[in-house]
Swiss-Prot record:
Described function: Uptake of citrate across the boundary membrane with the concomitant transport of protons into the cell (symport system).
Side of membrane Cytoplasmic, spans: 1-25, 73-84, 130-161, 205-235, 295-301, 354-363, 419-431
UniProt GO BP: citrate metabolic process
One Pfam family cited in the UniProt record for this chain: MFS_1
Gene: citA
Membrane-crossing segments per the record: 26-46, 52-72, 85-105, 109-129, 162-182, 184-204, 236-256, 274-294, 302-322, 333-353, 364-384, 398-418
Localization of this protein: Cell inner membrane
Phenotypic consequence of residue 414 to A: In transposon Tn3411
Biological source species: Escherichia coli
Protein known as: Citrate-proton symporter
Record has Membrane as a keyword: yes
Record has DNA-binding as a keyword: no
GO molecular function terms attached to this record: symporter activity
Length: 431
């Protein structure tokens, strides 16, 4: 029988399983940062705002595919195994990445260009729908007793490494290439780099071992049974979706949308926006395992409640302070404050979500809740934030969207743990 990774091999297991997360976030961040260049290449329009909104709409379309991927691929992983499923998601994600990198512009192939970019995003979204769930469940099942929050936090921590690497590459391009060169062809270079690392990630994932928890399961549910169980637990899925809303909205605001927000709304330089994003990625990387470890010690609920309340009280004031006199220092401080919210909350939230899902549908349940939240909240954050600024004329208006997500997180935490306290669903760890 395949053995669960030993303590000595834990780091290697975490590295192998989170490598796909790295690729996913690397591509998503690039799409957000180079949105203005992608808009000009694939969506020519008289209005820069219209072209940018079309680009963010395509970006968001990938998130609409996530729930479908969560159900289809999540059911496969729960039935066949974690390792095999994660290999398939990586292959699909790689195809989407390659397509976006290679598609000629609108001037070359006309309407086919935006259509192919859309297909690439849909493929990425389909695979990403289960990537986070599959990785989170894998990490939770290899975690040592009392450390599940710390282990699962590395799912998101790996994404922060991708953000830092992508931002460093972008900064290098801005230093070595001119604006016209980046606009015409330079923005594609990071996407090609993403394509080049796909074979390495395949090699890493091939050496993954199946988790002992999955191998010991005597019952392997069929697809119909999985869907029936999900339907019976729709309240848990709904609460889980709202629970994720806080983390996914904050994350996509401080990473994917921030570079565009800094350049087009606050009129900061591209280099300043990239440096801020790098600092945010590093900050996220630090706070995520801290949040997970603290939740292992004091419970998930105190961390989740405390952070959502803090976000509700402080978000609008700090956004007003930023937009009153926007500069590099203020933007850095505000986004690092939001980074603290994200890291602490997400560190506890991922572990909590794996614990409340019924064991036989843990991957599909987690992935569906996460994907719905990402589609409704996170994926649309750039478009909604852009629209809020355009419609209201208030540069701080995206703060209202962040507060809405925090309110969802607070409500979900209250509802979910009230049900757990009443015995609605048993869990495996201290909540």
């Amino acid at each position: 029988m395949t053995q669960q990774p030993s303590r000595a091999g834990t780091f290697g297991a975490i590295l192998r399983v989170t490598s796909g997360n790295f690729l996913e976030q690397f591509d998503f961040f690039l799409f957000g940062f180079y949105a203005t260049y992608i808009a000009k290449t694939f969506f020519p329009a008289e209005s820069e705002f219209a072209a940018l909104m079309l680009t963010f709409a395509v970006f968001g379309s990938g998130f609409l595919m996530r729930p479908i991927g969560a159900v289809v691929l999540g059911a496969y992983i729960d039935r066949i195994g974690r390792r095999k499923g994660l290999m398939i998601t990586l292959a699909i994600m790689g195809c989407g990445t390659l397509l976006i990198a290679l598609v000629p512009g609108y001037q070359t192939i006309g309407l086919l260009a935006p259509v192919l970019v859309l297909v690439g995003r849909l493929l990425q979204g389909f695979s990403a729908g289960v990537e986070l769930g599959g990785v989170s469940v894998y990490l939770s099942e290899i975690a040592t007793p009392g450390n599940k929050g710390f282990y699962t936090s590395w799912q998101s921590a790996s994404q922060q490494v991708a953000i830092v690497v992508a931002a460093l590459i972008g900064y290098g391009l801005n230093v070595t290439l001119g604006h016209d060169e980046i606009s015409e062809w330079g923005w594609r270079i990071p996407f090609f780099i993403g394509c080049m690392i796909i074979p390495l990630i395949f090699v890493l994932r091939r050496s993954l071992q199946e988790t002992e928890a999955f191998l010991q399961r005597k019952h392997r549910p069929d697809t119909r049974e999985i869907f029936t169980t999900i339907a019976k637990n729709w309240r848990i899925i709904t609460a889980g979706t709202l629970l994720v809303a806080m983390t996914t909205t904050t994350f996509y605001f401080i990473t994917v949308y921030t570079p565009t927000y800094g350049r087009t709304v606050l009129n900061l330089s591209a280099r300043d926006s990239l440096v801020v994003t790098m600092l945010v990625g590093i900050s996220n990387f630090i706070w995520l395992p801290i949040g997970g470890a603290i939740s292992d010690r004091i419970g998930r609920r105190p961390v989740l409640m405390g952070i959502t309340l803090l976000a509700l009280v402080t978000t609008l004031p700090v956004m007003n302070w930023l937009t009153a006199a926007p500069d590099f220092t203020r933007m850095t401080l505000v986004l690092l404050w939001f980074s603290f919210f994200f890291g602490m909350y997400n560190g506890a939230m991922v572990a909590a979500l794996t614990e409340v899902m019924p064991v036989y549908v843990r991957t599909v349940g987690f992935s569906l809740a996460f994907s719905l939240a990402t589609a409704i909240f996170g994926g649309l954050t750039p478009a909604i934030s852009t629209a809020l600024v355009q419609l209201t004329g208030d540069k701080s208006s995206p703060g209202w969207w962040l507060m809405c997500a925090a309110l969802c997180g607070l409500a979900a935490t209250t509802m979910l743990f009230a049900r757990l306290s009443s015995g609605y669903q048993t869990v495996e760890n201290k909540l």
